[in-house]
């Protein structure tokens, strides 16, 4: 299966993207709003399918035990942030098959789980903005058109801890 953070499409009853993230976290892993300490929001990203994704960052209690909704997800696992700080764990692949320009995908392998694509980019941005850690690999290909660079790496809308 595909590895990702809890999330999904905004429903009519959701008042904001943040509300969507809270609802999806509750639906997928049983995380209740009272257990979430909002930290900030990463810049929006454009998925390969043209969906605008709004990543939120939160702290949750150490003792939280996920209640997996098997209709939504297959499994849930934890990865220590220190794993992503190790440059040997970070792989970069260059692709040419999607359109006329080359692009990069970022990859991590952790205990049989393949963490890649937008999920990997979100982690890279979190480490960059939250810890000041800069990856040895660039987030996007230098020859990618400007709109791809903007979609993958908005520097002007950096981590904003006051937006909910």
Task: Give the location of each predicted region.
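Short, His- and charge-rich active-site/binding loops that engage polyanionic ligands
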Residues: 1-10
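Long, low-complexity, intrinsically disordered segments
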Residues: 161-164
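Unchanged
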Residues: 9-111, 115, 124-159
């Amino acid at each position: 299966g595909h590895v990702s953070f809890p999330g999904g499409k905004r429903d009519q009853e959701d008042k904001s993207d943040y509300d969507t993230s809270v609802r999806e976290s509750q639906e997928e892993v049983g995380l209740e709003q009272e257990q979430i300490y909002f930290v900030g929001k990463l810049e929006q990203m454009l998925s390969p399918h043209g969906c605008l994704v709004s990543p939120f960052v939160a702290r949750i209690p150490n003792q939280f035990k996920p209640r997996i909704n098997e209709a939504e997800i297959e499994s849930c696992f934890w990865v220590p942030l220190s794993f992503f700080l190790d440059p040997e764990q970070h792989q970069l692949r260059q692709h040419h098959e999607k359109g006329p320009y080359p692009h990069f995908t970022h990859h991590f392998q952790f205990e049989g789980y393949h963490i890649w694509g937008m999920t990997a980019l979100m982690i890279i941005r979190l480490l960059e903005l939250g810890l000041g850690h800069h990856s040895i690999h660039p987030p996007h290909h230098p020859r990618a058109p400007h709109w791809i660079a903007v979609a993958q790496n908005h520097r002007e809308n950096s981590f904003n801890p006051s937006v909910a």
